[in-house]
Amino acid sequence: MADRSDHLVAIVDDDDAVLDSLRFLLEVAGARVATYHSASDYLADAEVRPDCLILDQHMPDMTGLELVERLRADGVQLRVMLITGLNSPPLRGQAAALGVTKVLEKPPTEQELLEFIAGPG
């Protein structure tokens, strides 16, 4: 397995079970992981500089796409995986327009996660 210890992956999801399972899978693969329960929590952590971001689409304070839109407006360019229970063509179109790397239905597979964090960038 490739060395992923230099990758910092930020995960933003309001569901503790999802955060815990994604963190576990990525840490076992050797990635460093930072987790956040909301988009606001992520934005408040000025120190974080992840290599990639895994976002839930449906969160109480801000959707995943709203967070991506804000990051792009601030000039932040990083790879983003959007995970959702409702993967519709309009959502995929909006995500593509914002430069989201991947849109996947929950739960993403271990292979999908590992390929994403190992990707370019």
Describe the role of every protein-language-model region:
Residues 1-10, 16-17, 23, 43-44, ...:
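Non-catalytic signal-transmission and effector/linker regions of two-component phosphorelay proteins
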Residues 16-34:
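Two-component/phosphorelay signaling modules centered on CheY-like receiver
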Residues 35-52:
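Acidic, metal-coordinating helix/loop segments flanking the phosphotransfer/catalytic sites
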Residues 37-38, 63-66:
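Acidic catalytic/metal-coordinating carboxylates
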Residues 59:
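Receiver (REC) domain active-site loop signature in two-component systems and cognate sites
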Residues 65-77:
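Short amphipathic alpha-helix used as the core "switch/output" element in two-component signaling
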Residues 66, 87-102, 115:
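Alpha4 helix (beta4-alpha4-beta5 surface) of REC/receiver domains from two-component response regulators
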